[in-house]
A protein has these predicted regions:
Chain A
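Short active-site loop/helix that positions an aromatic residue
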Residues: 76-85
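Long, compositionally biased stretches
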Residues: 1-67, 87-93, 97-148
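Extended catalytic/binding region for NAD+/ADP-ribose chemistry, centered on the ART fold
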Residues: 71-74
Length: 148, 75
């Protein structure tokens, strides 16, 4: 199927790859079908594009790239809801709020996106502890820092 | 909004499955116990609101964002 996207124009997507957020996301309760789009030449960020609303897209990333020790436990309810059987099936992503300059961007560690890769069921999981912030700073070595 | 007065150890039932009890009142703070089916998600309001706000902020980025990102995030 073809969809119109916020950032990359019209694209063709494989229906098998649709990600189902059955109860939407906080603030977007009606949005339950998304697709992950890779950014060409960028191996850190992906786009989580709503299939229903072309103007709705989030920039997401693997939080472990920024916070190596990021860790939490999934409660029974989400394990049942997403029918998680194997830890290996679980993909964790964080929504990034991009700022200009880029290094001022933040990621939401308090409410990670949990995706069961096997059946494509997903949910934004709100951690009950205050251990991780909604606006966690990112620090990524820039090309200059790496001496590239 | 329905307003009910309750004392310590009293409770409110919502529907068949949900019970909200007042466990303790200490000055300005009230300790509330909530019994509900697992499918009912219970959050402190300010946390839920913060997530909602953050989601809407993250969804409202400029459409020319990708141009800005070019070359910034290559590993």
């Amino acid at each position: 199927m073809h969809i119109e996207t916020k950032y990359v124009g019209k694209i063709e997507i494989d229906e098998q790859k649709l990600i189902h957020f059955e109860t939407g996301l906080p603030g977007f309760k009606e949005e339950n079908k998304f697709v992950l789009i890779d950014l060409p030449g960028n191996d850190v960020l992906q786009i989580l594009q709503s299939v229903q609303t072309s103007e709705l897209a989030f920039i997401v990333t693997n939080p472990h790239l920024f916070y190596k020790d990021y860790e939490f436990t999934l409660d029974e309810h989400i394990i049942e809801t997403l029918q998680i059987e194997n830890e290996q099936d679980v993909v964790v992503l964080s929504i990034m709020t991009i700022q200009d300059p880029f290094h001022a961007s933040t990621i939401n560690l308090q409410a990670p996106l949990i995706i069961n890769e096997r059946n494509k069921l997903a949910k934004q999981y709100i951690l009950s502890s205050d251990e991780y912030p909604v606006k966690a700073k990112i620090s990524l070595p820039t090309n200059e820092e790496k001496g590239v | 909004m329905l307003v009910l007065s309750r004392k310590t150890k009293e409770a409110i039932r919502i529907g068949d499955d949900i019970e909200v009890s007042i466990l303790a009142i200490e000055g300005e703070q009230v300790k509330i116990g909530i019994q509900a089916p697992k499918s009912i998600e219970v959050y402190r309001k300010e946390i839920y609101d913060a997530i909602q706000l953050q989601n809407s902020e993250a969804a409202n980025l400029p459409e020319n964002l990708l141009t800005m990102l070019e070359g910034k995030t290559k590993k």
